[in-house]
Amino acid sequence: MFFKALFLSLYLFFFISYAEIIFCIRIKRNNLYNFQNMTNSLNIKNLDDVKEKVKYEKHTYCLLLDKYKVNKILKNKRAKFWLLDIYKFPSVLKYKEYKNCFLQNDHNDKNNHMLNFIYNNYLKKRNHQNVKNESENGNYNNDHNDHQTCNNMNIFFSNEYLKSLSNFNEEDFRLIPLNDFFNKILLELFYKQREEIIHDDVIYSKNNIKSLSHVFNDNSPEQYRQKEKQQQVGNIIMCNSNSPEQYRQKEKQQQVDNIIMCDENLCETLIKDDEINENDDNKNPLENLCEDFKKDKDDIENIYNMHKLEYIEELFELIKEEDIKFQRVKLEFGYDNMNTSEILRKIFPCINEIIHKFEIIGHIAHLNFCDKLESCKKIIAEIILDKNKSIKTVINKKDILNNTHRTFNIELLAGENNYVTQLKENNIRVKLNYELIYWNSKLKKERDRIYNLVKDNSIIIDVFGGVGIFSLSLSKKSCLCFSNDINEHAYKYMNINISMNKNKNILTYNMDGREFLEKLFNLKIFSKNNNVLTLYINDQNQKNISLDVLNSKNHIITGNGKNKSKNKNENKNENKNENKNENKNENKNENKNENKNENKKDIQNNNMCEKENNISDRKCPYIHNNNNQRNITCDNNNNNNNMNVSGNNSIHQYTDMYEHKFKYQKIGEENMDNSKNEENHKIDINLNIYEDIHILMNLPQTALEFLNVFKKYKKEKNDELRNVFIHCYYFAKPEFFYEHAEKNILLHFNQLPKDIKITEIRKVSPSKLMYVVEFNLKDLL
């Protein structure tokens, strides 16, 4: 009975445990497979743990030479190819500091003998070629001492070498480390030169057998010497036989034996170093790391494959001429000798996605972490912040772009809480607040493509302009630019960027995209029949543009020439007017010189007018660039906009209306802010200078829905239209990208244009790509 109860209790226990496991798998799958304890498994909690984790050692050959001969190596481009190039590690080391890191050249060091063998055979070939050349020229000398003794040369540093030097001083010697390509060429040359010795009947005489034995005699292991003797005998027999097939088989077996006899430590070093070199990337580690590294590595590999023999001969020549020795040294590397990419690969070798999923915006590094990296994102952020001195802030995007202004919630991972940053793209300075404004550095290639596509003297209409980067770029091609964004913060920095870059051909607006396009339709800007464009602009656009620039074909020459002095005078006058307005409400003594001919009553009336202008600006929004209707006055009772004022009225008439309207209204404080005061400025632009129109609609989430606004454009009879090219960006699945664009165009226009061009911009996710559809609106109107 007892055993039965025990059996039932155990059965019940296992059944409940099994049920809990099934419940976790089905209901709590995310928590079960979320890699929450990844950093705990690595035992990394801070930067000190990271530094300890990434330490490694490297055994490498070094050139040991006098400090006065170092420049001959460094200035030789061919020899420089073989030098070690590790991030923030010196190319030249002091002998005194690294003498304790020397690896002893004992009698069993096969790597050293292999290098001796290659170097001496190189000298033998060179001497043999010199003798041959001398014999052809009739200057043959029977002295073969050099030829006989070259194989006995030891090119490695030793204590005996030190004793042979008079007045030895440690301060006078330097070490130059060699890279992994040097190790690689050693193996290749070793097998290649042995094959040449085996195949060449002339070289393989008795004297050459003896000279070859000198290379490995005494300094090589007993097993290797026995193996070498067997190979020599076998090779002599094969040279006298007429069985090439057996010779090839014997040769293959010999190569295998040589590989086995080769120092295993060297092979392991080569393999490990190749793995490390795959992480080498001296370029910016925060932008397309994997692709950039592959390109760099391929370039170096190509150089190696094409010029390795020339370069190694050049190095051996320098070694012979300058009496340079070799020494194997143990070098230690760590956190300071690795860039961001290498450190992340070392710590997280199985997670490639963290290497390339962040971008730089000025001093801000923006990362997109997946769930499985949630527990280690702080460590990664600290590494990025510490290894990149230009980065001050590291952030993570918490959610997707799901609002009108295309901004997202920011999670500060490391660094300063400062999101106002500056960056430079194609010599254009851009300032923005990354927390309040959308910016994507990955669209640089698309901006360059549009720049190359647009011709000079075009008209640019950027409906969703952001900080105005498209207009800032295309303004260099003497284009008339209209840049708009509904985000008031983007509008603010758009004007700041125009001022920073000293552009004088960009008009800026802060309106809804549909309303912005409708107002431009009323300007008849699409028509070739309209020769002069008359605009009424606000104070901000008055500062942004220059009529001399807009009415010239080459904006750059005009802007840098005569117009420069005019702009200075205009700016001086504007500054004087601004200073007057600011100082009117200050003490009488400060304004005495500026307002000598004005009486107190006029000053008071002017102040009343200006302050009421501020009130009117706050009460009723100003609609820019409307020829037919102007928002001039504001009704006190219902705050409705008055649209009945003609566009031909002068600025003085508007001022008189303001004075009459608010003459008797009480003034509050005398130092009221006048910064928002706006007046209408009439400008005329010669449209005959400009040709095609390009409408940029970079709002991929909803841009296709805005196409229906073009149906409101009414073409007049006998009206010849310009080419109006639409560049509409959108998201779509890769298998339906063309059908998606075609469907939306048909939906809004009931027909398709003659030519439709669709370009893939970038991959947002595996099932979501960004495209741009381009067509001529002229075909649909």
Swiss-Prot record:
User: What EC number(s) would the UniProt record show?
Assistant: 2.1.1.228
A Pfam family found in this protein is TYW2_N_2
Tell me the InterPro entries matching this sequence.
MeTrfase_TRM5/TYW2, SAM-dependent_MTases_sf, TRM5-TYW2-like_MTfase, TRM5/TYW2-like_N, tRNA_Gua_MeTrfase_euk
The chain's coiled-coil residues are: none
tRNA processing as a keyword of this entry, yes or no, is: yes
Composition-biased stretches (Basic and acidic residues): 567-610
Q: What is its main location?
A: mitochondrion
Q: Give the reaction(s) catalysed.
A: guanosine(37) in tRNA + S-adenosyl-L-methionine = N(1)-methylguanosine(37) in tRNA + S-adenosyl-L-homocysteine + H(+)
Q: Where found, per UniProt? A: Mitochondrion matrix; Nucleus; Cytoplasm
Keyword annotations for this protein, in alphabetical order, are: Cytoplasm, Methyltransferase, Mitochondrion, Nucleus, S-adenosyl-L-methionine, Transferase, tRNA processing
Region listing for Disordered, in residue ranges:
556-610
Annotated residues that bind S-adenosyl-L-methionine are located at: R447, D485, I486, D512, G513, N698
What does the subunit comment say? Monomer.
Protein's UniProt name: tRNA (guanine(37)-N(1))-methyltransferase
The species is Plasmodium falciparum (isolate 3D7)
